[in-house]
Amino acid sequence: VYKRQHFGYTQNDDRGYIVKVGDKAPDITITYTDGTRKKLSDFRGKIVMLQFTASWCGVCRKEMPFIEKDIWLKHKNNPHFALIGIDLKENREQTIQFGKDLKITYPLTLDPEGKAFYSFAAQGAGVTRNIIIDKQGKIVFMTRLYDPEEFGKMCEVIDRLLD
């Protein structure tokens, strides 16, 4: 159930999230495959899409080509946008191979212990999730699994925030 609310949608969410739309996003540490580390707060002033994924997740594998085509290729050169794939509980080599297998060009980062994931989702919650964060660091939209209608709404939210 979605209700329009200024830039995003409010969502009644019982899908395993421990955060909600309107919350300040937890300031997680993001570790790139080259070892570079950043805090989520380093991206303040940008629209950020966090994409939680894993190579063993069939739904993730189905969704990621759409993220590549409909979001990343459209916005990758926009200095006000960041897309960060976060690979749950896999090592560097697995993460790099996962990106190659799916021909993903957006950054896939490491979350070997699930610290980033469990800052947003409950223990035992499923992995296919996207979180859109506004320039002030607030959560404005969240998805669970891959639903084409919800994915389309997420694309609209990103487009509006970048207008």
Q: Language-model segments: which ranges?
A:
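Conserved hydrophobic packing residues within short motifs/helices of P-loop NTPase cores
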Residues: 50, 84-86, 131
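Alpha/beta-hydrolase fold active-site loops
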Residues: 47-48, 81, 128
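Short, small-residue-biased leader/transition segments that mark boundaries at the very start
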Residues: 1-2
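Thiol/disulfide oxidoreductase modules built on the thioredoxin-like
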Residues: 100-105, 111-159
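Structural microenvironment flanking redox-active thiols in thiol-disulfide oxidoreductases
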Residues: 61-102, 112-119
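Short, ordered coil/turn segments that flank beta-strands lining enzyme active or ligand-binding pockets
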Residues: 33, 43, 135
